[in-house]
Amino acid sequence: ELDIQLVVLAGFMHILTEEMVAAYPNAILNVHPALIPSFCGAGYYGLHVHEKALDYGVKVTGATVHFVNEEPDGGPIVLQKAVDILPGDTPEVLQRRVMEQAEWHILPQAVSLFCQGRLSVEGRIVTIKEGE
């Protein structure tokens, strides 16, 4: 039997089964290409997220790392990073900027915090403990 302590979803555009989520409470991290609770939930993945952000006219978007629960993109938020939307952005350009400026930074940071035992979850609130 494996001793799995953390599952990381990056570019995994599928909803996990209830059994999988229940087997790893507060031990599955996902990165979402928006500032949750905006542009998230069932159907909000990939380029669609950035299309919706541009269509809505928001000035800032970003990325969120959160623990996975039974609700798509509904788990407790670990880290977020904002990214400006620039005039002339296309969904593809925005997607790339969000990946490079936010996702690629906060996902490894969240994994590191988890592995150091520095994340505490109470309800929807994630607290980051001071490092030693």
What is each PLM-predicted segment?
Residues 6, 10-125:
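Donor/substrate-binding cores of folate-linked one-carbon enzymes
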Residues 1-5:
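Glycine-rich phosphate-binding loop signature in dinucleotide/nucleotide-binding domains
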Residues 131-132:
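Phosphate-binding loop/pocket of nucleotide- and phosphate-handling active sites
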Residues 128:
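Conserved catalytic region of serine esterases and O-acyltransferases that act on ester linkages
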